[in-house]
A protein has these predicted regions:
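Mid-domain alpha/beta scaffold segments of enzyme catalytic cores
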Residues: 1-208
Length: 208
């Protein structure tokens, strides 16, 4: 049984743990042998001059996703700049055929507008989803997948599980990924093995 962590900022001590480590384009990038990474421009660090560096790093063979990218109304950067950088990363993900891992805070309308306008081909995964079930349904209907950590709403978790578009993550938490799986499996009334199998299948499908 493999417990996939689709989004973390903490490289796993055991390289046999399948985890996608998220690195901002402003941070040093020193990939470990065998590691998997996502590289992007976070809306908290929005700056157009980071796009060339992002493009260079995104082509690295150990970078399997783009992000985290997205929109955040609590960030200092103007929303217009955030949208510009987000759209650039959407296009980059499509160009490189890599999934996009998304950070979104209070900007769901803008996020869906970008998706409708650009009509991307690459999979989109909203990380750390904490919204309610109606928002989850809206995002799922638009073709997105949702990733959950320890903090979430049970109704949205169930909605996403029923649609088979659920991923699991630790984000920046020190909690072991196995405990996150145990928590989510318990709320869904399924075995950890069943949840792990579903997430593994979904994760593998991202790249085929």
């Amino acid at each position: 049984m493999r417990l996939y962590d689709v989004h973390t900022h903490r490289p796993p001590a055991d390289l046999t743990t399948p985890a996608v480590v998220s690195i901002d384009a402003s941070e040093p990038f020193e990939p470990r042998p065998g590691g998997c990474y996502a590289v992007g421009i976070h809306p908290w660090h929005a700056a157009a001059d980071r796009l060339p560096l992002l493009r260079l790093r995104a082509a690295h063979p150990q970078v399997v996703m783009i992000g985290e990218a997205g929109l955040d109304r609590l960030a200092e950067a103007p929303m217009s700049l955030q949208i510009e950088l987000f759209e650039a990363q959407v296009r980059l993900a499509d160009e490189l055929r890599k999934p996009l891992i998304i950070h979104c805070v209070r900007a769901w309308g803008e996020l869906l507008d970008v998706r409708k306008r650009l009509r991307p081909d690459s999979p989109w995964i909203v990380h750390g989803f904490r919204g309610k079930s109606p928002l989850a349904t809206q995002l799922l209907d638009a073709g997105l997948s949702l990733s959950f950590g320890l903090l979430h709403r049970p109704d949205a978790l169930r909605t996403t599980w029923d649609r088979r578009r659920l991923f699991v993550e630790t984000d920046d938490s020190p909690t072991p990924i196995v405990e996150v799986y145990e928590c989510i499996a318990g709320e869904l009334h399924v075995s950890v093995e069943s949840l792990a199998h579903d997430v593994e299948k979904r994760f593998t499908a991202l790249f085929h």
